[in-house]
Amino acid sequence: MRIYSAKLKNFRGYHEETQIDFNDLTVIVGKNDIGKSTILEALDIFFNDGKGCIKPDNEDLNFDARIGGEDTFSISVEFSDLPKEIVIDSDACTTLESEYLLNINKRLEIKKTYSENGKLKATYIVAEHPSNENCSNLLTNKITDLRKILQNFNIECDNKATSNIIRKSIWNYFSKDLKLKTCDIPVDKEDAKKIWSGIYKILPTFVLFQSDRQNKDGDAEVQDPLKEATKRILRNEELQKELEDISEKVRTELKKVADATVNKLKRIDPAIANILKPEIPESTDLKWAEVFKSVSITGDEIPINKRGSGVRRLILLSFFMAEADRKNSDRGDNNDIIYGFEEPETSQHSDNQRILITAFKEISKDRNKQVILTTHSGDILMQLDFENIIMLSGDKKKKITSIEPDQLCYKSLNEIDYIAFDNPTSAYHDELYSHLESKELIGGYLNTIRQKDYIEKNKYTGEPMPVRKIGLSKYIRHQIHYSDNEYNEHYTNQELRESIDLMRKYISKEKSN
C-alpha cells in the first residue's frame, strides 16, 4: 500500500481542508514555519496514535477553528496499491471494493477525528457506499441483524454463517437501488470494529526521523535497537542453557565461599552463624540483559557522542531505518514501510547530502517502501526529478503546488531556489538575462518593460556620462557586472524580483509562440 494523498483540517496551521499528494519519493519544500514538518507529524499521529514521535494535545487544534467554535481536527489518508483480498470477518476473505469501502477514485480513504484535547474521537472510512436505508448499515450490523434482513425481504443466501457473504447477498438484492453516495462509515463501534481490525493489519508502518535531536549513543533511539537485539539474542534456547550452566558454576563456587565464611563465624559466634545462610539468586532471576546496558557502536574506540554531528546523525539515521524494518517485521504481516525524514541535510556536508538523497531514491524504488522528506537544501533538490518535489506556500490558507520544469532549458539550482524557496538572487537574474541573449530575444524583451534612468561611467576618465533610459533588467545586469559604478542607486530586492518575474513571463510567452 502507498499513501496517495493526505488531508489536514483544523490541524495546527491548516484551518481549511488541505490535500497533499505523494509519490514513491516526495520532497516537501517551503519557507520556515510554513507547515512542512506539520505534514510529517500529522502522519505520525495518524499511523501511530500518539505512540510514535508525536503525541497530539490541546495545542494541535487550529486557533481560528477554536475561536470559531469548532472543537475537532481531522487527519485523513488515502491509499493506493491496495491488496486484492482482505480478511475482515473471522477467516473469510473479501475485497474492499465488494464491501463498498473505496472512495469515488477507487482508493481506500481513512479519516481520523480528534477532540480539542488531542484524543482520538472517531475513525471513519470515507467511501462510495449504499445509502438505501434497507442496506446502508450492513457493515455495522451484527450477524443476527443481517439474517433478519434476509428473512424480512426473502433474500436467498448460500451461506448464512458468514457476514460478508450475507452482506453481498443483500447488496445484490438491492443492486438497482443502492443509492451510492460518499459517506463517512464509522469503524470503531459495533461489528465494524472487526472491519477496522482487518484494515489496520494491512496499513503501512510509518516512522518519523526528526531533525531536532542530540544524536548521542545514550539516546533512546540508539540504545533501544541494541537493547532489543540483546533481549532477543538472550532469549535463544541454546544460549539460555549455556547461561544457566554458567550461573550454576558461579552459584557452586559462591556457595563454597559462603559456607566457609559461616563455618569460620561458628567458631567466633555460633548463635549468629546458625541464623545466617547464603542467598544466591537462581539463573532465571538474573537480569542478563543489564550486563549489556551500555552497548553502543564505536569506531577507532571513539563512541558516537564524541563523533562529529554529521557522522552522529548518519549513524542514528541508519539505526532509525533498521529499527523501522524490525518493527515492521515484528508485526508479522510484511507490511509496507513509509519513512518520514525531517531535513535530513542537517549537519551534513553537501557531498553527504548527495549521498543521502541517492540512498533515499534507491529506497523508494523498493516495492514496499515510500519516502517522504522535508528540506531546505538546494543540493538535495538538484538530485531530484520535478515530479518528486511539492511546494508548500500560503499563511492561513495553505497552497500545495508541484514544481514543473520552468523557463531555462537546463536544471538550474538558482531557478529551483527561486521556485521552491521564493528566493530571488542576482545569480538567477544573470541566468535568465543570459538565456534571453543566447536566444536573441533580449532586444525585444527590453522594449516591453519599464525604463529606468542610468548613468554610465566613462571607462577612460571615470567621469559620469549623460543620463539615459534603459530597461529595468539591463539596469540590474549592469549593477551586477559593473559594481564599481557609484553613480546609480542600487536596485532593491523588490526590483530584482520584479525583473526576474518579467523575464520569466517573457520567456514563457516566447515558448508558447
What is the predicted role of each segment?
Residues 186-192, 198-207, 211-339, 471-475:
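Extended helical coiled-coil dimerization/tether regions that scaffold
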Residues 83-89, 119-123, 217-220, 381-383, ...:
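Switch/connector loops and helix/strand junctions flanking conserved nucleotide-binding motifs
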Residues 91-231, 470, 475-478:
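Electropositive, glycine-dotted interaction segments
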Residues 41-104:
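Conserved P-loop NTP-binding catalytic core
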Residues 70-75, 106-108, 118, 202-206, ...:
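Short glycine-/polar-rich loops that comprise or flank the Walker A/P-loop
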